Each structure stands twice: as structure tokens, then as C-alpha cells.
Curated annotation (Swiss-Prot):
Gene assigned in the entry: TVP38
Gene Ontology BP annotations: mitotic spindle elongation; vesicle-mediated transport
Organism (species): Vanderwaltozyma polyspora (strain ATCC 22028 / DSM 70294 / BCRC 21397 / CBS 2163 / NBRC 10782 / NRRL Y-8283 / UCD 57-17)
High-level lineage: Eukaryota, Fungi, Dikarya, Ascomycota, Saccharomycotina
GO cellular component: Golgi membrane
Membrane topology: Multi-pass membrane protein
Topology, Cytoplasmic side: 98-118, 165-232, 289-319
Name the record gives this protein: Golgi apparatus membrane protein TVP38
Length: 319
């Protein structure tokens, strides 16, 4: 009996080891990482800390490469060029950061004196609200660099962001509705939030969507595919979240202060303030996102139960 038990135990561990190796082989080849299968293989509680780090790293790299090679050739070229430019700018910033900061301060002071600057900023912020445009965070931080934490800066951001979002949503809800549906299908996170919006499309839920870590312009277009979301609720949801724009103004003002001061301690304080602000914003956004995912899972489970109940067979039925 002991021999049989040991044989069964050995066979059990061999099977587990084989399944574990097979999973990582599939992981390397990109198999088994679809939206429906991704969460089925996260039982990594029995892995060591080092194995978990390696697992998460390999998973992240694989997902990035899968998404990258799924793009059109011209999109991959643009992404590579953009990544190269960001790397060059980061290197230049590291080497010539003092000169660059002083130049930014001079330019911001000049732009602040021009009457046309608010109009230009509102226009640019308005247009980056349309997918696939990018640059909302950059323009918002630039506004903070020019006007600091001020009512004028907040009004510029609020007008551009709210009007741009509403117009983008209206366009994709009506004329470009098919394109909006494709935007939702591009990301399962969008699909999850779309399911929640179909259950509850109040402006509070839409405000929560704006606080989650989703691309700004893509969110405006994707929500247009959700049935039942009104322009009124979408507008109110965006207005509610306009205080969030003060964060961009704060970051811009700290960057400007770093260029104006000569004190190393003051620069370090400003840099730490920026990092802590970004970290707090990121943590808040991800907490909200994971709570949203939990609610989405509850809706999925409830839908499964309802479907199962609908398919119950009458035991008295005879053929």
C-alpha cells in the first residue's frame, strides 16, 4: 500500500511539473494568453519571490510584443520612432537638464504674456480628445508650466478637455459608431467597463471611468459604442472630474520652479513632490480600476447564473 501511495504521489507531482513546464512553453510562444485564458493561469502562490518576478516580467514582455506585432507595419514604425525620440529626449534631459529647464522657464514666461496662448492651448487640448490623438498629459502639464496652479490655467484645461471629450463622444456615438465598437474590442479593459456602463450608465460611473488609467482620447471614442450612454451624462461625468486637472497644473508649476531656483534642496523637494503626486494618482487610478474589475466579474457571474437558470430542463419532459 505504501508503495502504491508513493507511486500515486510521484505521478501527481510529475503531472504538475509537466503542466507547469507546458504552461511556460505556451507562454514563450504566446499561446494561452488570450483575454479569456489570461486569468486562468495565475495560480502562482506556490512560486518563490524570484520566480514570481521572472514570471511577471516574462508575461509583461510577451504581452507587449504580442500587441506590438499585432499592429500594422506603419504603426510599428511610428511606435519605434516615437520610442527612439523619447529615449533621445530623456538622454538630453539628463545631460543638459539645467539649460533645458532655464529655457523652459523663459519660453513659459514669454507665452504667458501673449494673449493668443490660451486660445492655442484650448484648441490643441480640444483636438487631442479625438482618437487616436495623443498628448493630453503633455499639453496639460505645459499649461501648468505657463500659468501654474491658477484659476486661469484650470479654466483653459477644463474648457478644452470637456468640450473636446463631448464632441469626440458625440462623433463616435453617431457617425463613427462602428469605429467606436472596434476601439472597445481592442482592449478587454474597455470591454469590462462597457459591460458595467450597460448596467449603470450614470454620470458617477462615467466620472469613475475618467479617473481610471485608460488612454484619454481612446476612452472618449470607445464610450460612444456603449448603448444607453447619453451625451448629458457623459458631459456631467467629465465636468465632475475637472478638479483632477489641478494635478497637471501642480506638476507643471513644480517643473517651472525647478528651473527658477538654484537651490539643490529646493529642486530635490520639487522633484520628490512630482514623483509622489504621480505615484498617488497612479495608485488611486489602479485601485479604482481593480474595484471596477471586481464589479465586472460579479456581473459576469450573475449573467452566467441567469443563463444557467434559463436553460434548466423540465424533469417531467418525455421524448
Amino acid at each position: 500500500m505504501a508503495d502504491n501511495y508513493e507511486a500515486r504521489t510521484s505521478s501527481h507531482y510529475d503531472n504538475n511539473a509537466t503542466e507547469f513546464d507546458d504552461y511556460f512553453n505556451e507562454f514563450d510562444t504566446g499561446i494561452g494568453l488570450g483575454p479569456d485564458d489570461e486569468d486562468d493561469f495565475l495560480d502562482i502562490y506556490n512560486l518563490s519571490p524570484r520566480q514570481r518576478v521572472v514570471y511577471q516580467f516574462r508575461r509583461t514582455v510577451n504581452q507587449f510584443l504580442s500587441q506590438y506585432y499585432a499592429l500594422e507595419p506603419w504603426q510599428r514604425i511610428l511606435l519605434a520612432i516615437g520610442g527612439g525620440l523619447i529615449g533621445i529626449l530623456a538622454l538630453l534631459m539628463l545631460i543638459f537638464h539645467n539649460k533645458i529647464l532655464h529655457k523652459l522657464v523663459e519660453m513659459s514666461n514669454d507665452l504667458k504674456e501673449k494673449w493668443s496662448t490660451p486660445i492655442v492651448l484650448v484648441t490643441l487640448i480640444f483636438f487631442v480628445a479625438f482618437p487616436p490623438m495623443i498628448g493630453f498629459s503633455l499639453l496639460s502639464t505645459t499649461t501648468g508650466l505657463i500659468y501654474g496652479i491658477s484659476f486661469k490655467g484650470w479654466v483653459i484645461l477644463a474648457i478644452g478637455a470637456v468640450t473636446g471629450s463631448i464632441c469626440s463622444f458625440a462623433l463616435f456615438k453617431t457617425i463613427l459608431h462602428s469605429r467606436a465598437e472596434k476601439l472597445i474590442q481592442m482592449n478587454r479593459r474597455f470591454a469590462a467597463f462597457a459591460s458595467i456602463l450597460q448596467e449603470n450608465n450614470s454620470y458617477w460611473i462615467l466620472a469613475l471611468l475618467r479617473l481610471c488609467p485608460f488612454p484619454y482620447s481612446l476612452t472618449n471614442g470607445a464610450v460612444g459604442a456603449v448603448y444607453g450612454v447619453s451625451i448629458k451624462n457623459f458631459a456631467i461625468g467629465n465636468i465632475i472630474t475637472t478638479p483632477k486637472l489641478l494635478i497637471y497644473l501642480f506638476i507643471g508649476s513644480r517643473i517651472k520652479n525647478m528651473g527658477e531656483t538654484e537651490s539643490s534642496a529646493s529642486k530635490i523637494f520639487d522633484l520628490v513632490s512630482i514623483l509622489l503626486t504621480v505615484l498617488a494618482l497612479g495608485l488611486t487610478a489602479w485601485v479604482l480600476y481593480f474595484k471596477t474589475q471586481k464589479r465586472y466579474q460579479q456581473l459576469q457571474d450573475q449573467s452566467t447564473i441567469n443563463t444557467s437558470n434559463d436553460l434548466d430542463i423540465d424533469q417531467n419532459f418525455e421524448i
